[in-house]
């Protein structure tokens, strides 16, 4: 309890994420939950903490608003339309709840493309920090009305984690309908025990979250583990908290042993490398020989064309690509200095041969080490 209390006492900026499962009920938006959430965030604000809220619920709210009865899986156009209906209803509920405590809120809707462009990524940071300076609580959601499947964040757990790193927040709290991370499936095994502290996200910890077909499903426990890894790389603390527990945020900040806390790593990844590793979606893959893998993993070197034995995918200069061993295992991700057609032409060659093949040589490296993130 003492360790938890110390972590929360030091926290200045906090990201809180709430999902559809606890935001909605059979009657639509769970207004009493939002009222309680506003009260708790007001308490944190009064205690000197800055709070950013990441809120799901637009599609679910829209579905309830127009009494959508079709039980079939929603298509993209239905999701987008329901999000458009539900988002305004959701924000109105937040405005009323926070207004009771004389707090202002601001809506921010993001797509993955907003974070993929470095300038827009930094502009989002500046906007949110300015809102906090104004004393306004940002309420952020994925813009489901315009997002397409291949450019989605995947879930708001990921969005919350990315924002935690972007804003250099100290803590990311994911409030969920599950009490904590368990060592076994608690709905199937009565001996399952909650893990209250995780010091390292090992393969064993990831296995405890199940797979995408488990009871947790997409946006469930597995996505929260992925989010915790992102927060971990940025030097922050991640929390999985029981969203339906009374006064959950106040109890967490009091150091109470509820939920699961993922302790931060000691070394924070640089901001640009966090962006490369977690925000950008790789457009292709480079297969590397053993020598190149060793140079990257042990020598901290840049990737030269001589170590590349194969490529896949189509990409342009400046795009993100995976760097893999010959067996396909990924060791790094980075920004390429050459388009795929040029990399294919110079793979296996010495850097001094680039100019004779491409008729120019802007860079000796295919990926400079400053734009390379080692993953294993």
UniProtKB/Swiss-Prot annotation:
GO BP term, example: L-proline biosynthetic process
Binding site for substrate: 56, 144, 156
Residues of the PUA domain: 283-359
Subcellular location: Cytoplasm
The keyword Cytoplasm is assigned to this record: yes
Catalytic activity: L-glutamate + ATP = L-glutamyl 5-phosphate + ADP
Binding site for ATP: 17, 176-177, 218-224
Pfam short name (any one): AA_kinase
Family per similarity comment: Belongs to the glutamate 5-kinase family.
UniProt protein name: Glutamate 5-kinase
Organism: Desulfotalea psychrophila (strain LSv54 / DSM 12343)
């Amino acid at each position: 309890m003492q360790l938890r209390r110390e972590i929360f006492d030091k926290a200045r900026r906090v990201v809180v994420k709430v999902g559809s499962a606890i935001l909605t009920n059979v009657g639509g938006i769970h207004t009493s939950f939002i009222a309680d959430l506003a009260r708790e965030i007001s308490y944190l604000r009064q205690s000197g903490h800055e709070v950013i809220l990441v809120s799901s619920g637009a599609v679910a709210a829209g579905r309830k608003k127009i009494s959508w009865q079709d039980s079939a899986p929603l298509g993209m156009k239905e999701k987008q339309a329901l999000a458009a209906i539900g988002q305004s209803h959701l924000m109105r509920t937040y405005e009323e709840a926070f207004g009771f405590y004389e707090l202002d809120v601001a809506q921010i809707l993001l797509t993955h493309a907003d974070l993929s462009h470095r300038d827009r990524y930094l502009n989002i940071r500046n906007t949110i920090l300015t809102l906090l300076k104004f004393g306004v609580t940002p309420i952020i959601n994925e813009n489901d009305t315009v997002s397409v499947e291949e450019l989605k964040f995947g879930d708001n757990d990921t969005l919350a984690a990315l924002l935690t790193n972007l804003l250099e927040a100290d803590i990311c709290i994911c409030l969920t309908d599950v009490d904590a991370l368990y060592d076994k499936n608690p709905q199937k095994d009565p001996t399952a025990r909650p893990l209250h502290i995780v010091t390292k996200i090992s393969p064993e910890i990831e296995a405890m979250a199940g797979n995408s077909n488990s009871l947790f499903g997409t946006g469930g426990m597995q996505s929260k583990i992925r989010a915790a890894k992102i927060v971990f790389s940025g030097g922050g603390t991640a929390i999985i908290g029981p969203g339906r527990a009374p006064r959950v945020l106040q109890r967490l900040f009091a150091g109470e042993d509820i939920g699961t806390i993922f302790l931060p790593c000691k070394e924070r990844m640089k901001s640009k490398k966090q962006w490369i590793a977690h925000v950008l979606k790789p457009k292709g893959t480079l297969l590397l020989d053993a020598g190149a893998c060793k140079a990257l993993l042990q020598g901290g070197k840049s990737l030269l064309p001589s170590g590349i034995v194969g490529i896949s995918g189509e990409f342009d200069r400046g795009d993100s690509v995976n760097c893999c061993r010959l067996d396909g295992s990924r060791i790094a991700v980075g920004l390429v200095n050459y388009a795929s057609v040029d990399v294919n032409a110079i793979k296996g060659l010495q850097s001094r041969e680039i100019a004779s093949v491409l008729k120019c040589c802007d860079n000796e490296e295919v990926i400079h080490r400053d734009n390379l993130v080692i993953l294993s």
